[in-house]
Amino acid sequence: MPIQFEHVTHIYGEGTPMAYTALHDLELSFTEGKMTAIIGQTGSGKSTLVQHLNALLLPTKGTVYVLDRKIEAGSRPKGLKSLRGDVGLVFQFPEYQLFEETVLKDVSFGPKNFGASEEEAIAKAEKALQLVGFDKALYQRSPLELSGGQKRRVAIAGILAMDPKILVLDEPTAGLDPQGTVEMMSLFARLNKIGTTVLVVSHDMEQVFRYCDEVVVMADGKCRLHTSVKEFFRDGSICESLGIVPPAIVQMKDGLKAKGFHIDDDIVDIEALADCIARQVKKHE
């Protein structure tokens, strides 16, 4: 079953003078097996949306379907513990959630909490730490002694150790340096290639363009647009209509097309664009 929101409304502080509607009659389906970006202005409902996927928030009205679970307004969903194992949610700055004495204990905590033996939990933790490129020499180090980037890797490994079927990422590269950003996004893309559905909240259009398959645009608690990345960035016009600055490479492609170059819509990096231009220049020499 796809991930589906049916007429979902979420109101913070319902019935109080401070009531605020974050999601308004939301109708939206996510494609399983894809890497989908969720974008929109601050306050558009992005973070509220993703917290419904593992029932951290429940709908005020409507129904959310995730895998084989049904999350309804007014009722506690069945199989809540297993749902939170299947849907891994990585918050912005997840490193603030680290608490164990050592890195290995922290990452193995989740699997043990879900019934894995000590040996199984350690094996899952080590596999997850290897996935995020964490130095084995630091496994017995206190998480509090690590750098910011190292803490981020440990926190994400803690989610991956649960073997989630769906990985939900809320600004996962915030605060990382360029190299760390590329490494993390490449990891998420690899996980997606082997079958994990990945949903990523992002404001970085360069990341969306390079790594994602689909784009969901949120505005005023509703889905304003859901389309493929290829269509969304085809010529920059959709971005401009939404007040979004297109990625630099999309702007370059548009400029080159205006000069008469034939640029393939599938080109997503500077190297491929340079090769395309070089071939056309050489052809006309």
Segments the model singles out, each with a brief description of its role:
Residues 54:
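Helix-to-loop junction immediately C-terminal to a conserved catalytic motif
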Residues 62-73:
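Conserved ABC transporter NBD signature motif
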Residues 119-137:
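Conserved ABC ATPase "signature" region
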Residues 142-146, 150:
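Conserved ABC ATPase signature
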Residues 159-160:
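ABC ATPase C-loop
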Residues 167-170:
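Catalytic Walker B motif of ABC-type/P-loop ATPase nucleotide-binding domains
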Residues 208-210:
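A short, surface-exposed alpha-helical micro-motif characterized by mixed small hydrophobic
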Residues 220-221:
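Conserved ABC ATPase "signature" C-loop
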